[in-house]
Amino acid sequence: HFLARFYGVLFLCLEVILMNADVVIVGAGPAGIFTALEMLRRGSSKKIVMVEKGRALEKRSCPKVKTGVCMNCRPSCHITTGFSGAGAFSDGKLSLACEVGGDLPTLIGERLAQETIDYADKIYLEFGADEHIEGVGNDEKVRRIRARAIKAGLKLVDCPIRHMGTEKAHDVYLGIEHYLIDHGVEMYFDTECRDLIMEGDTCRGVYLSDGKK
């Protein structure tokens, strides 16, 4: 629940249950994935549904590999949508310092931001991420480069990186997908959230592209 709060994932509790769900998570990107994982790890007995307009990870493939040009896939791009979002086909670099990557430290404080990064990193390790970290153990080189950067009016941010690589990132996310399914999370792929069901200021559910709610 705290990861959901930090990353702003759409986290909906349903009172009118027409999909046999207590909780709907819209989007199976990192925020949605970690929300579902956190609920399971905290012993939630709620029926969880994830709604994702892209495909399951094992069914995602880009035709550009064969055609050499973007085919503008419809209804959605296989690279940017689907389980784990664009991260599944990235080079899998995880920045492990709160000084880079956004304004989370400003919003919640540096200590809590770093604790959250460390917590998420441990989960990646549990699912098979490489234990080696780049960017550590070169203190003297970093010191010299930082001194040169200061003279040039620049700020050097020393950030450790866990580099999974494209294939390993794919395997890690596939393992997480199977874990969620095996632990009862129901996934609606190729399904888009079209609208919210509102009662005053309270969200009671969602309307989906397949007609369900």
Question: PLM ranges: what are they?
Answer:
Residues 36, 40:
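Gly/Ala-rich phosphate-binding loop of Rossmann-like dinucleotide-binding domains
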Residues 1-18:
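Short, Lys/Arg-enriched N-terminal segments with co-localized hydrophobic residues
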